[in-house]
Amino acid sequence: MTLRLLEDWCRGMDMNPRKALLVAGIPPTCGVADIEEALQAGLAPLGEHRLLGRMFRRDENKNVALIGLTVETGSALVPKEIPAKGGVWRVIFKPPDTDSDFLCRLNEFLKGEGMTMGELTRVLGNRNDPLGLDPGIMIPEIRAPMLAQALNEALKPTLQYLRYKKLSVFSGRDPPGPGEEEFESWMFHTSQVMKTWQVSDVEKRRRLIESLRGPAFEIIRVLKINNPFITVAECLKTLETIFGIIDNPRALQVKYLTTYQKTDEKLSAYVLRLEPLLQKLVQKGAIEKEVVNQARLDQVIAGAVHKSVRRELGLPEGSPAPGLLQLLTLIKDKEAEEEEVLLQAELEGYCT
C-alpha cells in the first residue's frame, strides 16, 4: 500500500518515483523542523534531498512524508528505517530494475576502485567485446547478463561490496538518540567489523560515513571537502579526538564508574557497553589484568538498575568473579527465564 501511495503521489506531482522516498510512521505531533532534522541525519548517505509534502494516514494514525532526491539511488544506500522521535520511521522507495540496480552498484564499486567499465572488460579478456563501448549507448538487457557471467568467475570478492554488515549508528549527540551508540561502544564495534571487510579504503570510508549522523557526520563531511583523499584511519582518529575520552586514566576511570544501566536497557547490553571502557582501563594500567573480572562484576552490580544482581545470578559474596563470557551466559539465561515468565503470564491473561 505504501509503495502504491508513493507511485500515486509522484504521478500526481509529475515526478519520477525512483527519485523520491516515502517516510512513514511519523507522529502527528512532529513538525517540519523535527522531520527535516531526522531526515538530515538518517538520509545523509543519499546526498541532497528535500521534504516535498506530508499526509495523514488514518489507518496508522501517523503521518507520511514525500522526500525528493536529486538523482536515482540504489537499494544499497537507502536505509529501511531511520531513528527519530517516536522510535523509528520506515523508509519506502521504488526499487530499480534488477539489471539496472546491478549495474548501478557495479559502477559505484568500479568508481571506488578507480576503474572504468572498459578497463574491467579488458581485464576479463573481452578486448573486442561491445561492453567496451560507451555505457550510454548500451542497454542493460545486453550488458548485465554478460557482466554477471564474467563476474561470477573473475570478481567473486566484489560480493563483499554488494552484501556487507553495516556499522552501528553514531552521531556524537549527548545523550545518543534512538538507535544510536555511545562513542566507545561504536568505536569498538566499528574496529571489529572493519577487520572483516576485504575492500578498498575508499569503500571503507563510504561505509564509515554511511554510519554517521548529526555532528559526527558534519565533521567528517567538512574534512572530506577539505581533503578528498582523507583515509579511514584519519577519520577515526578525528572522531576519537573530538568524541573519545581524554587520554587520561583518571578521567577514563571516572567515566567507567559513572556509566550506569539505562532504564530500558537489558543487563547483557549494559555489560557489553561497559566492556570497551574496562578494556581501555586495562590497557592504561589503571586496572590489573588479574582483577579485571572482579572489577567488571563490581561495576555491573553498582551500575545495574536492580540492586539484587548478585543474588539473581547466584553469585555468593566472596566467590570468584566469572569471566566475561560466563557472566554474559548467566545474565542471558536469567533474561530468557524472565521473558518466558512474562510470555506465560500474557498467554494466561489472554486465555482467561
Swiss-Prot record:
Q: How is it modified after translation?
A: Ubiquitinated and degraded during mitotic exit by APC/C-Cdh1, this modification is inhibited by TRIM39.
Q: Which GO terms describe its cellular component?
A: cytosol; mitochondrial outer membrane; nucleus
Keyword terms of this UniProt record: Apoptosis, Autophagy, Cytoplasm, Membrane, Mitochondrion, Mitochondrion outer membrane, Ubl conjugation
What residue spans carry the region label BH3-like? 120-127
Q: List the disulfide bonds.
A: none
> Which PANTHER family does the protein's record reference?
MODULATOR OF APOPTOSIS 1, PARANEOPLASTIC ANTIGEN
Q: How does it assemble?
A: Homodimer. Under normal circumstances, held in an inactive conformation by an intramolecular interaction. Interacts with BAX. Binding to RASSF1 isoform A (RASSF1A) relieves this inhibitory interaction and allows further binding to BAX. Also binds to BCL2 and BCLX. Recruited to the TNFRSF1A and TNFRSF10A complexes in response to their respective cognate ligand, after internalization. Interacts with TRIM39. Interacts with RASSF6. Interacts with ATG8 proteins MAP1LC3A, MAP1LC3B and MAP1LC3C. Does not interact with ATG8 proteins GABARAPL1, GABARAPL2 and GABARAP.
- Domain statement: The protein is evolutionarily related to retrotransposon Gag proteins: it contains the capsid (CA)subdomain of gag. The BH3-like domain is required for association with BAX and for mediating apoptosis. The three BH domains (BH1, BH2, and BH3) of BAX are all required for mediating protein-protein interaction.
Which protein is depicted? Modulator of apoptosis 1
What is the species of this protein? Mus musculus
Per UniProt, what is the name of the gene that codes for the protein in this document? Moap1
